[in-house]
Amino acid sequence: MDENSELGGLETMETLTELGDELTLGDIDEMLQFVSNQVGEFSDLFSEQLCSSFPGGGGGSGSGGTSNNSSGRGTSGGAADPAVQRSFSQVPLSTFSPSSTSPQAPALQVKVSPTPPRATPVLQPRPQPQPQPPAQLQQQTVMITPTFSTAPQTRIIQQPLIYQNAATSFQVLQPQVQSLVTSSQVQPVTIQQQVQTVQAQRVLTQTANGTLQTLAPATVQTVATPQVQQVPVLVQPQIIKTDSLVLTTLKTDGSPVMAAVQNPALTALTAPIQTAALQVPTLVGSNGAILTTMPVMMGQEKVPIKQVPGGVKQLEPPKEGERRTTHNIIEKRYRSSINDKIIELKDLVMGTDAKMHKSGVLRKAIDYIKYLQQVNHKLRQENMVLKLANQKNKLLKGIDLGSLVDSDVDLKIDDFNQNVLLMSPPASDSGSQAGFSPYSIDSEPGSPLLDDAKVKDEPDSPPVALGMVDRSRILLCVLTFLGLSFNPLTSLLQWGGAHNPDQHPYSGSGRNVLSLESGSGGWFDWMMPTLLLWLLNGVIVLSVFVKLLVHGEPVIRPHSRSSVTFWRHRKQADLDLAKGDFAAAAANLQTCLSVLGRALPTSRLDLACSLSWNVIRYSLQKLRLVRWLLKKVFQRWRATPATAAGFEDEAKSSARDAALAYHRLHQLHITGKLPAGSACSDVHMALCAVNLAECAEEKIPPSTLVEIHLTAAMGLKTRCGGKLGFLASYFLNRAQSLCGPEHSAVPDSLRWLCHPLGQKFFMERSWSIKSAAKDSLYCAQRNPADPIAQVHQAFCKHLLERAVEALVKPQAKKKAGDREEESCEFSSALEFLKLLHSFVDSVGFVASPFSSSSVLRSALGPDVVCRWWTSAITVAISWLQGDDAAVRSHFTEVERVPKALEVTESPLVKAVFYACRAMHASLSGKADGQQNSFCHCERASGHLWSSLNVSGTTSDPSLNHVVQLLTCDLLLSLRTTLWQKQASASQLLGETYHASGTELAGFQRDLGSLRRLAHSFRPAYRKVFLHEATVRLMAGASPTRTHQLLEHSLRRRTTQNTKHGEVDTWPGQRERATAILLACRHLPLSFLSSPGQRAVLLAEAARTLEKVGDRRSCSDCQQMIVKLGGGTAIAAS
């Protein structure tokens, strides 16, 4: 070999040389003890790696075995298994002759250049040496001179070190105690013949270029012969290609045993040897280079390495910190194993390309495990549903219902009790009574899910309680009707009377004496057959009623297994409704109906039969005679000892459960949460819910009964339209009658329907129920699956709109003498607001997961959003009326803006809020009160302009327009009031006040907002002329144009011969009175009529302002009248 190759191998061994200069064999023994202790503590960690090195258990065969690691990462074993070490140490030592060994084991010599002494380095990962071509691999040989020697004791020393660098490649270092560099002249040493333990060759992979880096630790064996000198042999780490790697074992007879390695992912080569001859595990490259370590015998005594001849120099004793190196290496290996598993977990859960830290990987893994558990739970439920459907099909073919939970379907009671916690939803109330299930709601009986004593092994129901199919009911009704129509009993009785033997004539020979028949029978003879006939018909009809309404109704026992199945799906449906999973809730509710024996119709024929039967049943239940007969039949069943006690209660409970299931399905259908079905299907579910709820009687709360009737009315109005509108009105009146004469039984959430305005809105207004309604700015969010809550939300917005419209565009009403007169603006608005405030106090906006009677009912509580708008409009009305105390009292509620409105960041809400603050600040008696009011007006004006510029569709456009008009009118009126106060103060001082540029700019901006709003909302025109005249007065403009604008508000108009929509643009009474005040106060005398006519106008304005309730303006008008009566000039300025 050339000198460059030798220098390249020397550079690779620098670190190993530095580590071995300062250690002794005593240190090696201490390290071995420490490692063996670590093996005892981490037995699981080392046993896995040991098994990968020694296939087949603890011992190995004579031939070397290979083991492939699927992960592609190399592992290094710790200490050898003690059992393996004992098995090797018990073999007696033998000797071999030099003649037999020398020719078969040729002398090998290691050519290594001398290395200068260097300081002891600290163990740390270093970059992997670049792989070199196989042709440049150096061949290392060791000269061996065998002699005979014996040793009473042997010791196995091995401790490989593994490091991992940042480039995802592995570096394998030699054990510290064996890392010594020999001189270029190797002295002969004695080699013991018996090799007791040969450490498995470690081959590490997963490098960037697909090569293997291997380093075989030297197996060292010591003997007690004092003449033996120890020479540690170091073999340089080599980089070889996996395609040319060959495993060979050198024997004493010279015949190598070769095993080709074909798998590039080879991670470990093991060669435990136990033979009489010397065997050395060797890796041979494609060019014949030997890349392995020869076992060398060492002395038994702890001879310091510094005393070994051969040019090894004495170094300083090892430092104390280096003794923990092995412990740190083990810890790093332990952490490396954990990191590998976390990486494998990441690849399984998120894929190989995902990047996430360890805690995130574990969190995702936990979430994925929970998801798999949920999927398993749903699959288990689907399996249960399919089994139930299979049993139902068998039931229709004549199989007993008791086979529903037979042992053939693997639903034994023991397995069910073990898995009930996984199949049942969590408890809704931790404080439930012991007699009820923790999974039941308070107002309904508990389900025996966890009580073994309650789950009976009896059949689900007696044969009579299985129920009849609706087709069978209709067939029986048709046969009964045909029987009563044709009445075959009449012909039967007549035939029996004709064949009476007493009336047969004598047919013998002779004469008969004529005689008269006596009429002793009288009227009873012809009445008796008729009475008997009707009696028989009545018995037949009564039997049919009993069969249909008593025996034909399916009833389940409270603690049967069918009841358990029903309650399990019922609770799951409640949870799905609370989570918003309406499709899953509908599936569970349909399963509940199937368990109850009331499956939904699947074909048109079944739907027609079911709908017809429910119409007939609802008609029969209204007959008092039928209800009395059914009650007597139930009492007879109760008194009969052969039947189960409480059959009537069980029947009512089953009817209640079925009614609630039908009711909730009906709610989901009419709110659009499920795929749209036919109108007949909705009517069918509504009638089923009503019929069964009335059959339940006292088992169902009155509030729930009212809710079921109202939902049926809504379903008929929305789905059937005008065709069956009278039925919607009938069910609405029926619901009101159930509330009692004083509406004592009606819940607070339904009280609005008992008000005349609520009834009128329900029947006349064109409201609609949407499946995905937009979030409203004026009402809090209601339960999306409750149609009554959605209609109530529409009614609240309707009342709010009516209240604001009464302020901005009051409607004219006709009295007896055909004299048109506007209604009082403020009183009508306050009436609507008071009614709205009473209705929003009892209806909430969040659906409760487990409410008292219905999951879909909104939780009780006030609608804080609608209440805030009510308070804001009340503050505006109070300020316009001049009621300062009411403004201050209601302003405290306006300051508390709900969080739902704060989140929206709506500019209209901010405009209303700052307008209310400006009105409140204008009432302050402080010096800076008017300035603060002006600042709030500026901020409100900016937000109002932003709300007008907002593009996009809103959920309530008409309500937005009236609120924007009211806010703009309030800001302009407030600015006018502030200007008049300053002008009045200047008049008292004898000065003339002119509005500043800032005041005029703010007024012009609000006036521009009013003009822009008038383009899309015509009622805003009635305010435009008045405020245009006001801004001209503030600016001191020409009074001619100002007088024309005021005349536009002063003229009276009639509604005759007017086009549609023009009435909305005419000024109202309040605008006319305000125009009179402005003209009399600010216009010159030349533009006004005589003083007598001026007094008439002021008196008329005073009456108008007093009627509408504007106290502030009315007081100003009366003061002007007083001044005019005293002879003071009104317009001296």
UniProtKB/Swiss-Prot annotation:
Residues 92-109 have a biased composition (Low complexity). Pfam families: HLH. The keyword Coiled coil does not apply. One of its GO terms (molecular function) is transcription cis-regulatory region binding. Residues 56-65 have a biased composition (Gly residues). There is a cross-link at residue 456 (Glycyl lysine isopeptide (Lys-Gly) (interchain with G-Cter in SUMO2)). Residues 114-134 have a biased composition (Pro residues). Keywords: Activator, Cholesterol metabolism, Cytoplasmic vesicle, DNA-binding, Endoplasmic reticulum, Golgi apparatus, Isopeptide bond, Lipid metabolism, Membrane, Nucleus, Phosphoprotein, Steroid metabolism, Sterol metabolism, Transcription, Transcription regulation, Transmembrane, Transmembrane helix, Ubl conjugation. Residues 1-473, 547-1133 are cytoplasmic. One of its GO terms (cellular component) is Golgi membrane. GO terms for biological process: cellular response to low-density lipoprotein particle stimulus; cellular response to starvation; cholesterol homeostasis; cholesterol metabolic process; lipid biosynthetic process; negative regulation of cholesterol efflux; negative regulation of transcription by RNA polymerase II; positive regulation of cholesterol biosynthetic process. Belongs to the SREBP family. This is Sterol regulatory element-binding protein 2. It comes from Rattus norvegicus (Rat). The gene is Srebf2.
